[in-house]
Amino acid sequence: MEYEFRRNGLDGSVMARFSMEHEVMGRWFGEELGDKPAATAAVLTAIAAIQAGELREWRLTGREFSLELDEEQARVYANVLGYDNQDELDDGMSLYDAELEASCGLEDLEAALQSWQAFLVETR
């Protein structure tokens, strides 16, 4: 899983870009975690608890995207995927799930979060 982090020099906003199959993770990092070290720390704490066997799973529901963790993987998905009545959507308006969800190993997410944490500190 490849990624790159950037900070806008004009307004200070942060963004993340992930490899094609993990694009939604970049949006989750930028939009849900953003420049909030406490949010990143909370997810890292949950990962540590899962790895220590203290938790079996953990979920964080955000405004646009949610994160689910279990003992093996992390899954980020757009909350719009909870839309149950796909029949009401026109053919051209169907939701393209592949761009709206991605999974990776728990250790991969942990490494990306640690890099994000370091990026936030280094670019302040």
UniProtKB/Swiss-Prot annotation:
Name of one Pfam family that matches: UPF0231
Family, as annotated: Belongs to the UPF0231 family.
HAMAP family: UPF0231 (MF_01053)
Protein name as annotated: UPF0231 protein Sama_0645
